[in-house]
Swiss-Prot record:
Family named by the database record: Belongs to the universal ribosomal protein uL13 family.
GO cellular component: cytosolic large ribosomal subunit; ribosome
Domain of life: Eukaryota
Name of the protein in question: Large ribosomal subunit protein uL13
Gene designation: rpl13a
Species assigned in the record: Dictyostelium discoideum
Keyword line: Ribonucleoprotein, Ribosomal protein
NCBIfam families: L13_A_E (TIGR01077)
Amino acid sequence: MFQKKAIVIDGKGHLLGRLASVVAKSLLSGQKIVVVRCEELNISGPLSRNKLKWADFLNLTMNTNHARGHRHGRSPSKIFWRAVRGMLPHKTPRGQAALDNMKVFEGVPAPYDKVKRVVVPSALRVVKLNTTRKYTVLSRLSQEVGWKYRAVVAKLEVQRKQRSSTYYRKAALVKAYRTQALKKFSA
């Protein structure tokens, strides 16, 4: 289903590849999508196996000059962005336009912390992955391969959750006072 406004997807608990395929399909239909909390995405398989696969990927270089070519994004948002790019015809104008309609973030930045976030049931780990199977959290893998900002993002997330809880406590109080006042004046 197509909406004019951007859909904000909370990446926590989703499997990376499954979410990337759903996002790519939606992008090709013209939908704008924002994925937040990419550091909480999951990859099936134990950390050791995923680290070995990433080590193979990081060894890709150019034959003539190793300093040029093959830039490997290590942040969770770049890893997810690249996974989606691999599912789009990104060398065509249509694919490039689709890729321009996507934004990815670690954590939940300011404009999107007040917006309703959705999940994709067909990509949730608890739905699609057997409970006995091991999985890797993307922030841990990123940290192991060179991402330096895991602690910073975690600290900012704690601050955001505190702000959010105080906001909702105040909103609940206002709602309670309003219902009290309505009861008082209606009687």
